[in-house]
Amino acid sequence: MTIAHKDFLPSDWHEDDSASEAASRNGLDPMMDAVRTLLVGVGEDPERNGLERTPKRVAEALKFLTKGYGQSLEELLNGAIFDLGHDELVLVRDIDLFSMCEHHMLPFIGRAHVGYIPDQKVVGLSKLARIVEMYARRLQVQERLTRQIAEALQEVLQPRGVAVVIEASHMCMVMRGVQKPNSWTVTSSMVGVFKESQSTRQEFLDLIHHKATF
């Protein structure tokens, strides 16, 4: 079947006035126009039933998926750093993460394990997950994401060491390219004592693979 499409200009597309005004206020118009162009490029009709609101939905989704660009460490932590005199390993593992590969803008999905050995100062546990989220909600490569999380903790806490491991499945390897759905990519970033001491590093690695008994 051959489907004929006309050439679309931004002025050709119409939405509900209130939705259009809201999109304009949120700065979505250029993104929506780009989505319409992409739809035409793949052979679709942006005005057909089912696609009329797709440009706005995609633009809003992309804004959410990249909201980390608008966040900062200072705002995220909001003063939740405490001087408790603690100097043993702190670990939060299995932090779910969702990010987007910067090469194909396809998702990669996985989990992060974040640990550090304090030099007196600790951060609220939920903040570790929020730091992961902030850097994951950007266009990323997994190697850089892993390093950025470690560097952020090192910056705000000045601990004796930081360890981050990320395990993720990349849709750019699952849905296209080599199409290997069972492959997982594992990256690590070790700072301070985790890099210098094999026993400290091994303790962290053993704990992230230890099965919970509750």
From Swiss-Prot:
A GO MF label? GTP binding
The enzyme's first-digit EC class, named in words, is: hydrolase
Q: Which InterPro entries match?
A: GTP-CH-I_C/QueF, GTP-CH-I_N, GTP_CycHdrlase_I, GTP_CycHdrlase_I_CS, GTP_CycHdrlase_I_dom
Q: What is its EC number?
A: 3.5.4.16
Q: What is one GO cellular-component annotation here?
A: cytoplasm
**Alphabetized UniProt keyword annotations:** GTP-binding, Hydrolase, Metal-binding, Nucleotide-binding, One-carbon metabolism, Zinc
| CDD domains according to UniProt | GTP_cyclohydro1
The pathway to which it is assigned is: Cofactor biosynthesis; 7,8-dihydroneopterin triphosphate biosynthesis; 7,8-dihydroneopterin triphosphate from GTP: step 1/1
Q: Which Pfam families match?
A: GTP_cyclohydroI
Residue positions annotated to bind Zn(2+) are: C101, H104, C172
What this protein catalyses is: GTP + H2O = 7,8-dihydroneopterin 3'-triphosphate + formate + H(+)
**Gene Ontology BP annotations:** one-carbon metabolic process; tetrahydrobiopterin biosynthetic process; tetrahydrofolate biosynthetic process
Matching HAMAP family: FolE
- Assembly and oligomerization: Toroid-shaped homodecamer, composed of two pentamers of five dimers.
Q: Which PANTHER family match?
A: GTP CYCLOHYDROLASE 1, GTP CYCLOHYDROLASE I
Q: Which family does it belong to?
A: Belongs to the GTP cyclohydrolase I family.
Protein name (record):
GTP cyclohydrolase 1
Q: What is the lineage of its organism?
A: Bacteria, Bacillati, Cyanobacteriota, Cyanophyceae, Gloeobacterales
Gene symbol here is folE
